[in-house]
Each structure stands twice: as structure tokens, then as C-alpha cells.
């Protein structure tokens, strides 16, 4: 004799009754209001200034600035540590990838790489180096 549905395990991992699956539809463009007040996006879809084959954002503390930029641009993405352990990777549902590396081939210049997969993004694929204001790189 069955007691019927009690709801005791509703919402738990094994529950199939009334389960809901949230679908992540976040895009990198959703984060522009968080990013652009401090890091303006130009009309071509780039952050920072033009550098040698990269974009450049200058600050008094490049590591902290790169972390702040990265944290503002990645909400809604799936995070993972890079296989080599030298950075983190954020992947959005549309396949857009943002990578943050503290150590790069340019000394004291952390980097954020943005690889856009959406055709209608306001942001262009780019690599941004964060450099210290007032150095020979400035």
C-alpha cells in the first residue's frame, strides 16, 4: 500500500518531482554596466589604449587592477583554473572565454585575454596588458 507523495525529499539531489533546471544565458555584454564606468569601452569594442599588438590599461597597481577588471567582466561564466596553474579561465554559455594571467612574458604586466564567440557582442576579442603608470612602458 502506497502512502503517496509526501514531498519529504523535494528539492534534493534525488528528487524528480517539481524539479527545475536553471539555464544560464549570461553573456559578457551583460557585464558591461559593471565594467565600463571604470574601464571605458571605445566605439570599436576595445578596452584601454592601443599598445604593441595588445591593449594597455595603466594603473598604480597592475595586479589589483587586472583582478578588478576580471572580476567585473566574468559574472555568469563558469570558472576553472588553467591546466598549467598559471591563471583562471571563465567560459560563458555562448563559448566566449576570458583568461586572467598574473604572470606573463612581459614582466610585472598581468594580462586578460578576451575571446568573443558571439557575432553581436559590443566587445571585440582582445588581449589587455596591465602596466604600472610612470614606468618605461608608460
Regions found by a protein language model. Give the residues of each.
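Repetitive, compositionally biased segments used for assembly/scaffolding
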Residues: 94, 100-101, 108-113, 122, ...
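Interface elements of modular peptide-recognition networks comprising either
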Residues: 106-109, 136
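Low-complexity, glycine/serine/proline-rich disordered segments
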Residues: 1-75, 80-83, 88, 114-120, ...
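Amphipathic, interaction-prone secondary-structure segments
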Residues: 83-105
Amino acid at each position: 500500500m502506497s502512502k503517496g507523495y509526501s514531498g519529504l525529499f523535494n528539492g534534493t539531489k534525488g528528487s524528480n518531482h517539481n524539479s527545475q533546471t536553471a539555464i544560464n544565458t549570461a553573456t559578457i555584454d551583460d557585464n558591461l554596466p559593471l565594467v565600463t564606468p571604470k574601464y571605458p569601452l571605445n566605439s570599436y569594442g576595445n578596452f584601454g589604449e592601443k599598445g604593441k599588438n595588445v591593449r594597455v590599461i595603466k594603473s598604480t597597481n597592475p595586479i589589483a587592477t587586472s583582478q578588478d577588471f576580471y572580476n567585473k567582466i566574468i559574472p555568469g561564466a563558469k570558472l576553472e583554473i588553467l591546466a598549467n596553474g598559471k591563471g583562471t579561465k571563465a567560459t560563458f554559455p555562448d563559448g566566449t572565454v576570458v583568461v586572467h594571467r598574473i604572470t606573463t612574458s612581459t614582466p610585472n604586466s598581468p594580462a586578460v585575454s578576451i575571446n568573443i564567440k558571439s557575432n553581436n557582442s559590443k566587445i571585440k576579442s582582445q588581449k589587455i596588458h596591465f602596466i604600472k603608470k610612470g614606468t618605461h612602458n608608460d
